[in-house]
Design a protein with these regions (language model features):
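A C-terminal junction/extension of Radical SAM enzymes
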Residues: 15-89
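Hydrophobic, secondary-structure "cap" segments at the distal end of domains
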Residues: 64-68, 74-155
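Short, amphipathic alpha-helical interaction segments positioned at domain boundaries
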Residues: 178-201
Length: 201
């Protein structure tokens, strides 16, 4: 992994966290994270995403667009977009991009149609990063996949205080759950991959 650090007025890049001196062990980092969550909560900041906190109404709308699977358009060389079920990137080379615009040519460099099951996986991975969480009805309506296998995984995690349902019945991860979110999401994706599509009514 790459770790960026400020040294004086210059930015340096370190090749690995291991090069940092006195990095706390995993257990200490977890304790520090939970302490930070509680300290921010006691001062009126809500945790609306795994690593983001804000006062009510001041959430990052830009980031929420990505985390909730919203469509977005990017403009200019190398810009990325996700629109109408397709994900695409515009040409990176400035001259090729300008020529494409000027001459009415192709300015796309990469175009992908994302399979529905992959979108469903992204829904789980991204929504569970947020305090909005995931909904059985929403999941089944959007992706025509059964939620029951996922609920089994989440119920097991509830026993360890890592997942819960909010007042709206949506499944969300707890601060303890965020600490092991990669494991939880992996279990959910495995359950999803073995499920069979629902029949259209």
């Amino acid at each position: 992994e790459i770790c960026a650090c400020l040294v004086g007025s210059e930015m340096c890049i370190r090749d690995s966290y291991k090069e940092m001196l006195n990095l706390p062990d995993d257990e200490t980092q977890a304790d520090m994270y939970l302490a930070a969550v509680e300290a921010l909560r006691s001062r009126g900041f809500r945790q609306y995403e795994i690593s983001n906190f804000a006062r009510k109404g001041l959430y990052s709308r830009h980031n929420m667009k990505y985390w909730t699977g919203g469509e977005y358009l990017g403009f200019g060389p190398s810009a990325s977009s996700d629109f109408a079920g397709k994900r695409f990137t515009l040409k990176r080379d400035l001259q090729e991009y300008i020529a494409g615009i000027r001459d009415g040519g192709d300015i796309m460099e990469d175009l992908q149609e994302i399979p529905m099951r992959e979108r469903a996986g992204e829904y789980l991975m991204l929504r569970l990063r947020t305090s909005q969480g995931i909904s059985a009805a929403e999941y089944e309506k959007l992706f025509l996949l059964p939620f029951a296998p996922l609920e089994d995984v989440l119920e097991k995690r509830r026993r360890y205080y890592q997942a819960t349902q909010n007042d709206s019945g949506r499944w969300v991860l707890t601060p303890q759950g965020y600490l092991v979110s990669n494991d939880i999401i992996t279990d959910l994706l495995i359950a999803q991959d073995s499920s069979h599509p629902l029949k259209r009514i």
